[in-house]
């Protein structure tokens, strides 16, 4: 049994792939019904072959920055009718955009030039690697005749060895290919793309600048779709894992389920919800899994994030006598400085290909999606934890009413953001206090949600917003970005305007790096204030559609949101003036615990 990439059948299967919360047009795996346009034999060049392969796997947009080593390749990408080249202001944002696009569409791609472009995009590719996103990073390389000649080229560090870029990418991609001849090019390209999809990680593909326009018989006129053999469980291991887990859970009094971020890569969102339905357990999500499973399910109890969890969620999870974590990542951020009150002997850890029950046994070659589906058939129904939650739950209060023209509070801002959400919207949360405020948003069915928790690179959200909005055109995306993060990557607001996107950006201007203030304060956390609306107006420059507003009180915010919701075909930028000390209580708690973890003294030698 094999999975057919690029077929109508594959697209139909993808609609039920378990990627709950993803747009219908942007399934969690990169199968689409897009068919590359046929070309004549004379046009069957390397560049067109790559372009058609990208279209086959679901890439409609490539985020690029031109440079002399990739110009010919870009010509061939542009020539493919099913592919659009999105020119970005810098390579970092192009990489972030490919990251956001992969979140929306299942796979993304960016194109840069040799070394100066490659090393610039490297940070974004590292982030995509940490978040398990298949991004195809294409770099234009030197002329194939220059390899091994002892020549020194521009855009290098002045050595005749051209491998510096390749070696940098080896640590942040799952596969690397340097294409310097036509004979093997088709295999190198196909292997790189297939590996990205199979591993759900970025790949690096360097193509010599003199090759894209050259034809070769292997670049067939009507390319036959390649196949990805699906990963299957070892049946004996699967049965043993299910049996051990059923025994573990069925003897528990108040078991719970917790969804983690690797539900995405395992395409197990639907299987997880099916297990909730079958078991009756209360379920929560880890913060980086928000948006991967529905929050409208009656047994959903919120975000489990240790000391900064949703109210009453941590009490239920940590008091359970058995907890199944599906696809967790336990790092210092998600564990609030390693302060989780969890016991390993009570935990079942289900990773995409492995199950660990308590302190053992462990079962390898067990696919999460299959495991959860089989478990749902055999686990006993037990609603005790959910009933306990209902007994202690007290509805969350509302922010204090604002006085007329009172300076705007951040909790009032997010009260209004909550009202904006529906099934046609999505939320992008930047690293910082927006992490914590956006976690408290209650997502309607079908509302998307993305943030970058594992890598946590400030500025990610601007490029990711560009890419996500380009990949999910059925969504109106709402981005919450701090001023410090915005200063890193602000330029590509111009690309959003060029692409006629209609996202709504809330720029929270509180004068500094708030999240870092709460971890460790110092004068370096204060930034130069910008006229952010003036900056965006200057970027707009009368070309395209863009509307800006600066708000300082709730009355102005209400009016601005009303205008933004009315401007449905326009990029809307709302600068929110906030007090520098106006932070969520969760950030205050989280920051102190992460600070304590960071400042641990060295272990005695």
UniProtKB/Swiss-Prot annotation:
Substrate binds at residues 68, 155, 516. Signal peptide: none annotated. GO terms for cellular component: cytosol. It catalyses: a 2-oxocarboxylate + H(+) = an aldehyde + CO2. It comes from Oryza sativa subsp. japonica. Mg(2+) binds at residues 483, 510, 512. Residues 433-515 are annotated as: Thiamine pyrophosphate binding. CDD domains: TPP_PDC_IPDC (cd02005), TPP_PYR_PDC_IPDC_like (cd07038). Homotetramer. One of its GO terms (molecular function) is magnesium ion binding. Keywords: Decarboxylase, Lyase, Magnesium, Metal-binding, Thiamine pyrophosphate. PANTHER family: PYRUVATE DECARBOXYLASE, PYRUVATE DECARBOXYLASE 2. This is Pyruvate decarboxylase 2. Binds 1 metal ion per subunit. Binds 1 thiamine pyrophosphate per subunit. Its cofactor is a metal cation; thiamine diphosphate. Its EC number is 4.1.1.1. The keyword Lyase applies.
